[in-house]
């Protein structure tokens, strides 16, 4: 784990400038979640509007919305693909994203252009440097 001030950045993941992370699993699917920075900036989460299973998304499309006591925020797809699973535990317990944003993923995607799109994402070290610049 890399620490940037009060924020944690987990190694082995890919990151976007919008503070989403992507984890490539052994079967080639991708878990998507929000970073520690995102959950701290949002504050206490009240609701996660999970995407529909079967939904096709392009990289950068809105994947879902998260409501906190402060605001409603959109979560963007870090890679293109089909939503094949959602973390239903978040429906009843959105605070799981506050408690451990790296273990509690939002959606699992079957990616359609993974090799190309991963090149456009940051690794943990690059994301940590990006956070330092904010």
From Swiss-Prot:
- PROSITE patterns, per the entry: BIOTINYL_LIPOYL, LIPOYL
Q: Does the keyword Phosphoprotein apply?
A: no
Q: Which domain of life is it from?
A: Archaea
Gene Ontology CC: cytoplasm; glycine cleavage complex
- Point out residues bearing the modification N6-lipoyllysine: 70
Write the record's keywords in alphabetical order, separated by commas. Answer: Lipoyl
Q: Which residues form the Lipoyl-binding domain?
A: 29-110
Q: Which HAMAP family match?
A: GcvH (MF_00272)
The protein depicted here goes by the name Probable glycine cleavage system H protein
Q: Which organism is it from?
A: Thermococcus gammatolerans (strain DSM 15229 / JCM 11827 / EJ3)
Task: From the UniProt record, report the name of the gene that encodes this protein.
Answer: gcvH
């Amino acid at each position: 784990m890399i620490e940037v001030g009060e924020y944690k950045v987990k190694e082995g993941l890919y990151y976007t400038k919008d503070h989403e992370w992507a984890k490539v699993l052994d079967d080639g699917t991708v878990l998507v979640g929000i970073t520690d920075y995102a959950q701290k900036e949002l504050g206490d989460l009240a609701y996660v509007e999970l995407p529909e299973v079967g939904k096709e998304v392009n990289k950068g499309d809105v994947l879902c919305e998260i409501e906190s006591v402060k605001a409603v925020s959109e979560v963007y797809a870090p890679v293109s693909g089909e939503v094949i699973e959602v973390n239903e535990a978040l429906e009843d317990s959105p605070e799981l994203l506050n408690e451990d944003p790296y273990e509690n993923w939002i959606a699992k995607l079957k990616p359609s252009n993974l090799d190309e799109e991963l090149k456009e994402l940051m690794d943990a070290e690059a994301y940590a440097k990006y956070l330092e610049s904010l």
